[in-house]
Amino acid sequence: MRVLGIETSCDETGIAVYDDKLGLLSHKLYSQVKLHADYGGVVPELASRDHVRKIVPLIKQALLDANTSANELDGVAYTKGPGLIGALLVGACVGRSLAYAWGKPAVGVHHMEGHLLAPMLEDDAPEYPFVALLVSGGHSMLVKVDGIGRYEVLGESVDDAAGEAFDKTAKLMGLDYPGGPRLAKLASEGVPAGYKFPRPMTDRPGLDFSFSGLKTFTANTIMAEPDDHQTRANIARAFEEAVVDTLAIKCRRALKQTGYNRLVIAGGVSANTRLRETLAELMTSLGGRVYYPRGEFCTDNGAMIAYAGLQRLKAGQVEDLSVKGQPRWPLDSLPAVD
């Protein structure tokens, strides 16, 4: 089976063609970072309009790169949610329309399921079952995964997600958008300097996350300390270590609770070097293993949507002719793939 995947949930237009026998045949990505940089964050209306401009040329190029015609496709997968409704509808309208015109089935994919399954694009993919840590700008969650669609959310963010906390803290430090990667780079120049940052919600049972208080603590520290580069770097490191330690503590608890020894990390924050190193050390100490996608598949992309969509199309799950977007969509409400 060969599927065209379309991702437009936020500020990246991602298109890919995936074949269940040959693997990933093409992968195109356009990022709107420069478009939104002057605003310090994503402007939904601008994001939607830019998707409209870029999506069809990218689809044509992806098919050309994959040496695939519409007749050779077996289906179309597009991100149905969660995300920005305007951006979602661009991908849904184009994906559903092309599928109808080509006489192919279409399926709407859950964006976070795409991230969760992104490590399956690698040669050394994890086997089920495993615990997944999904960390992005909009989500932080721990999920017990027993198969595709067999998900139990063990814990999630009750306010700011990890990626959101990175971006907001970076803005407090005067760093340009997108702030998360820039804050991580600044943190790499920092040294432990006696700052004692909290590890939120680790002093109580449970697997939920909360990073808004840590963000406020960091803001107060910034205002109280000298405004020089090294001090900012030290604060950035203390903040990053607090986030990473919190995520690691919760992962350890989730692994103990489930009895699993495989951990998957995915989503934009999974590209963070300190997080990868810390979780690798954790899994080594537990006699387990951590898996994550390559860097280009940590952020939003069409490849993960094509892969996830193919699994559901193979199981006979298809959309009707209506075009729908779901800005909010619980991951554990998805049907299982037998």
UniProtKB/Swiss-Prot annotation:
It is found in: Cytoplasm. The gene is tsaD. It catalyses: L-threonylcarbamoyladenylate + adenosine(37) in tRNA = N(6)-L-threonylcarbamoyladenosine(37) in tRNA + AMP + H(+). The lineage of its organism: Bacteria, Pseudomonadati, Pseudomonadota, Gammaproteobacteria, Alteromonadales. One of its GO terms (cellular component) is cytoplasm. It is an enzyme of class 2 (transferase). InterPro entries: ATPase_NBD, Gcp-like_dom, KAE1/TsaD, Peptidase_M22_CS, TsaD. It comes from the Bacteria. Pfam families: TsaD. It comes from Shewanella denitrificans (strain OS217 / ATCC BAA-1090 / DSM 15013). Fe cation binds at H111, H115, D300. Its main location: cytoplasm. PROSITE patterns: GLYCOPROTEASE. Belongs to the KAE1 / TsaD family. One of its GO terms (biological process) is tRNA threonylcarbamoyladenosine modification. Its cofactor is Fe(2+). GO terms for molecular function: iron ion binding; N(6)-L-threonylcarbamoyladenine synthase activity. CDD domains: ASKHA_NBD_TsaD_bac. This is tRNA N6-adenosine threonylcarbamoyltransferase. The keyword Cytoplasm applies. The keyword Aminoacyl-tRNA synthetase does not apply. Keywords: Acyltransferase, Cytoplasm, Iron, Metal-binding, Transferase, tRNA processing. Required for the formation of a threonylcarbamoyl group on adenosine at position 37 (t(6)A37) in tRNAs that read codons beginning with adenine. Is involved in the transfer of the threonylcarbamoyl moiety of threonylcarbamoyl-AMP (TC-AMP) to the N6 group of A37, together with TsaE and TsaB. TsaD likely plays a direct catalytic role in this reaction. Binds 1 Fe(2+) ion per subunit. Its EC number is 2.3.1.234.
